[in-house]
C-alpha cells in the first residue's frame, strides 16, 4: 500500500489545507487540484530516474487501494471531530461531526474493512488512557 504512505506527501510542498476549504467552490477546488498535481509532479521528478515511475504510480494507484486510503482519511477526520467535540469544542466541530458521522455510516455500507474498524474501536474514541486501560482490562 505505497499509496497510503505517499498520498499526502505533496503537502510537504503546498501545505495541508482542510477539505472544506479546498471544496469551498468549483474554482477553488480546481486550483487546489492544479497545485497538488504540480507539487506531486515536482516530487516525482526530484527522485532518482529509476524511482520516478514507481513514485508516480504510488501517488495515483486507482482502484481498491485508493478507495481504502480515502476511506481511512475520512475516518481520521471523523476521529478528529469526535475528539474535538469530546474536548468541548462543539462550536467549531459539532456540525462537522454530524456530517462526518453520516459519511462514515455510508462508507461502512460499502467498505466492510472500515465497518470492522469502527465496530472494534470507535467506542474508545475520546476516552482517556486510564479509561481505555480499565475498559480493556475488564474484557
Predicted regions and their residues:
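Alpha-helical, largely C-terminal catalytic domains
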Residues: 1-139
